[in-house]
A protein has these predicted regions:
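Short, aromatic- and glycine-rich surface loops/edge beta-strands on solvent-exposed regions
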Residues: 1-3
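Intrinsically disordered, metal-sensing/regulatory segments
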Residues: 6-275
Length: 275
């Protein structure tokens, strides 16, 4: 672009596309994208459950620690995105306070859910209950991922949206494995339970693509991400408590520490595909 004084300015502009209206075709299209990004990878991750159930108790603890590492990375990644998004909000909304409030509310909500599940299954959180909490935390994060994908397509960032789809699909396979890890302790897991966990963790990505595609609004991003932060951190606390009671040798063993670091490394590596 050249100004009237002859000064040239270079700026990349996203491809011009019509913002999609709410039609049956667009709803189906965004829904398919959300399914591919959220539900399908979670199912593929859960497919590792038979192998995990045959593993030694130390390796089961390692995979639980890996789940904690996955969610720790998810929490800090989402927190960074939440603060980045709140920086662009009007000052009247008090973006920083909004983010911290979202973290606190979601953390307290998951604490309540944990107490209810523990009361239903016994004094301590069972593997099934822990898997449910992990699925909830991942589902809230996938809501934010779907929002990012839907928004990128709605504003014309077609290449970015495509890269996000591929990256998040790979990313979420690891998260499906994280849900499967607590279930390895269960003597029997029924198919409806696995289907329910896959929907809890993956279906929010579908809702996120719809919201991002049809309601292009930066104000929604910060609270969604902050809610994911609080949920993920609360689930990590639950996993650590579970490992402290059940892991052979406690939290300081090489299997537990190595599993945690491996979880962080996996999420960082797959996250490069969406960066």
């Amino acid at each position: 672009m050249t100004s009237s004084t002859g000064i040239q300015t270079t700026k990349e502009i996203a491809a011009a596309v019509e913002t999609p209206g709410v039609t049956g075709r667009s709803i189906l299209g965004y829904g398919i994208i959300g399914f591919l990004v959220g539900v399908l990878p979670i199912v593929l991750g859960l497919a590792w459950l038979p192998s995990l159930r045959r593993a030694d108790a130390r390796w089961t603890s390692a995979f639980l620690a890996l789940t904690a590492g996955l969610l720790t990375f998810v929490a800090f990644d989402a927190l960074g995105e939440a603060f980045e998004l709140q920086a662009g909000l009007p000052t009247s909304l008090h973006g920083t306070g909004l983010v911290l409030l979202g973290v606190a509310v979601s953390s307290l909500a998951l604490t309540f859910v944990t107490a209810r599940l523990s009361g239903r299954t016994g004094a301590s959180t069972s593997g099934s209950a822990l898997a449910t909490l992990v699925a909830i935390g991942i589902g809230l994060h996938n809501l934010g991922e779907g929002l990012a994908i839907g928004s990128s397509f709605a504003i014309g960032e077609l290449v970015l949206g495509t890269f996000l789809i591929v990256g998040f699909m790979i990313h979420n396979i690891a998260e499906g494995l994280g849900i499967a890890a607590p279930l390895a302790e269960q003597s029997k897991v029924k198919a409806p339970q696995l289907a329910g966990l896959a929907l809890v963790a993956g279906a929010p990505a579908i809702a996120g693509t719809w919201i991002g595609g049809f309601l292009v609004n930066d104000i929604l991003g910060a609270p969604f991400m902050s809610i994911a932060v609080g949920a993920a951190l609360q689930v990590v606390v639950g996993i650590v408590r579970h490992l402290a009671r059940r892991a052979p040798g406690g939290l300081g063993t090489g299997h537990v520490l190595g599993g945690f670091l491996a979880g962080v490394a996996v999420m960082y590596t797959t996250g490069l595909l969406t960066g």
